[in-house]
Every structure is written in structure tokens, then in C-alpha cells.
């Protein structure tokens, strides 16, 4: 799984670097760095709860497994939604604050476009890591990651030449 995830997460930058300018890569990278920090907050609980979820599956404690999974999804919603909305609404101010000026102002739109992935990554992390892996469905997770990488490749090939960093963010 980690190989597919690594390819999937680095594909945008590689394709952007091949198809556009260094400036576009820089703008995209600024938006992605903010997203990566926020994703670590959103997905942190899933990592912590994985051993407990696996234990509940092993002990056939379905009610507890459902309860802990629901709590993890609620946590993702509670954390990801406000962060996503905040950084979409205040993307320009956030970029200025984090970069110390207006040099990366063109990262604003890519940042706004990329922010919904906080919610999507959070939900898929709970569904994949917390629910499917303890249930022995690693292959399903791998197939979904490969499908995501192929979709990303196709969308990047279509959107990056015309939209640059914003196309990579979609």
C-alpha cells in the first residue's frame, strides 16, 4: 500500500514539474505543504485507534468496532470541515502569513482547490485504515489507491497544461 500511496501523493508535483514552470511547482508546493500539515491533524486519531479497532474485530466485538469507527468519522468531520472552510475562505491571508509576504500569492487558488481533500483524505483514512484493514480488506484499500493514482494521472495530463498549479490541485 505505501508504494501506491507514495506514487499517488508525488504524481502531481512530478507532472507539474515536467509540464510547466518552476514557479507553478512552487505555488502548488506551498499549497500542498499547508494541506500536509492539516491532513496529519485530521488523520491522527485513525492511526491511534487502529490497534483498538483490530482488537475489536479479532474479539468479534462488532458493537464496539462500530462505535469506535463512528467516533473516528465524527472526529474527522469535526476537525476537517472547519479547517477546510477556514483555509478556503482565508487562503490568501494564510499564504501571506505563512510565506511572509506576497511572493506566493498565486498559491491562493491552488490552496482553495486542494482544501476539500482534507475531508476526503480524512474519511478515506477512517474507512481504509480503521475499518477495512482490521477487517482484512487490505486488497480493497490497495485497489482504491491504484484507482486514485490512475484518475490523478489522467486528470493531471488533461488539466495541468492549461491550468498549471490549479489543474494539479483538482
Give short role names for the model-derived ranges.
Residues 22-24, 70, 87-123:
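Interfacial segments at transmembrane-helix termini and the short loops linking adjacent helices
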Residues 6-37, 55-56, 92-103, 162:
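Helix-terminus/linker motif at the lipid-water interface of multi-pass membrane proteins
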Residues 32, 68, 72-88, 103, ...:
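Short alpha-helical transmembrane segments in multi-pass integral membrane proteins
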Residues 31, 35-74, 80, 128-134:
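Helix-loop junctions and terminal segments of transmembrane helices
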Residues 15, 49, 53, 90, ...:
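Hydrophobic side-chain positions within alpha-helical transmembrane segments
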Residues 17-18, 66, 79, 96, ...:
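A cross-family signal for key residues in well-ordered alpha-helices
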Residues 23, 34, 62-71, 75, ...:
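Juxtamembrane/transmembrane-helix boundary motifs in multi-pass membrane proteins
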Residues 1, 5, 9, 32, ...:
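Short runs within selected transmembrane alpha-helices of multi-pass transporters and secretion channels
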Amino acid at each position: 500500500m505505501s508504494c501506491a500511496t507514495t506514487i499517488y501523493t508525488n504524481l502531481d508535483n512530478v507532472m507539474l514539474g515536467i509540464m510547466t514552470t518552476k514557479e507553478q511547482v512552487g505555488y502548488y508546493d506551498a499549497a500542498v505543504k499547508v494541506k500536509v500539515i492539516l491532513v496529519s491533524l485530521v488523520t491522527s486519531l485513525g492511526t491511534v485507534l487502529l490497534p483498538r479497532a483490530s482488537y475489536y474485530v479479532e474479539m468479534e466485538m462488532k458493537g464496539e468496532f462500530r462505535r469506535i469507527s463512528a467516533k473516528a468519522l465524527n472526529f474527522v468531520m469535526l476537525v476537517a470541515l472547519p479547517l477546510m472552510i477556514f483555509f478556503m475562505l482565508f487562503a490568501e491571508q494564510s499564504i501571506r502569513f505563512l510565506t511572509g509576504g506576497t511572493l506566493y500569492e498565486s498559491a491562493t487558488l491552488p490552496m482553495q482547490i486542494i482544501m476539500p481533500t482534507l475531508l476526503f483524505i480524512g474519511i478515506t483514512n477512517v474507512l481504509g485504515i480503521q475499518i477495512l484493514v482490521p477487517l482484512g480488506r487490505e486488497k480493497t484499500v490497495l485497489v482504491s489507491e491504484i484507482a486514485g493514482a490512475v484518475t490523478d494521472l489522467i486528470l493531471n495530463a488533461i488539466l495541468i497544461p492549461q491550468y498549471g498549479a490549479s489543474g494539479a490541485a483538482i
